[in-house]
Each structure stands twice: as structure tokens, then as C-alpha cells.
């Protein structure tokens, strides 16, 4: 059950990143992700850090619009 709860918290973020990249050719900002999923930038940043740690998404530190889902 904890895994399901965890997936329900990060799945919308992964979906938003993938959709944004597909439509725009580059990654979204944290602010844009937060707007789409209806969460604070702090909450999104926390989830992004976990997703990066788990290898689900990647980004280039210090550069904007490099967040993307690992294929």
C-alpha cells in the first residue's frame, strides 16, 4: 500500500514532465510542473529529487528546462 501511495504522489509529475517534453521539445520548469499538478514548488522539488535519486527522471544541474523522463 505504501508503494501505491508513493506512486500516486509522483505519477502526475512524471506524466506532466513527459507530456511537456513531448509537446515542447524541452523540459518544464519546476514552477510549470507545480502549476500543472496543483502542488507547491517545494512539494514538486521534493518529489523531483526522489525521482532523480530513483533514476526515473534526469536533469542537468544548474541548467533550466533539462528535466526529462528516463526512457
Predicted regions and their residues:
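Short helix-capping/hinge SLiMs at alpha-helix to coil transitions
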Residues: 19-25
Amino acid at each position: 500500500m505504501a508503494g501505491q501511495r508513493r506512486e500516486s504522489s509522483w505519477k502526475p509529475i512524471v506524466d506532466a514532465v513527459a507530456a511537456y517534453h513531448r509537446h515542447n521539445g524541452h523540459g518544464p520548469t519546476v514552477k510549470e510542473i507545480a502549476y500543472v499538478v496543483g502542488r507547491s514548488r517545494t512539494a514538486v522539488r521534493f518529489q523531483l529529487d526522489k525521482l532523480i535519486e530513483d533514476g526515473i527522471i534526469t536533469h542537468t544541474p544548474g541548467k533550466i528546462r533539462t528535466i526529462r523522463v528516463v526512457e
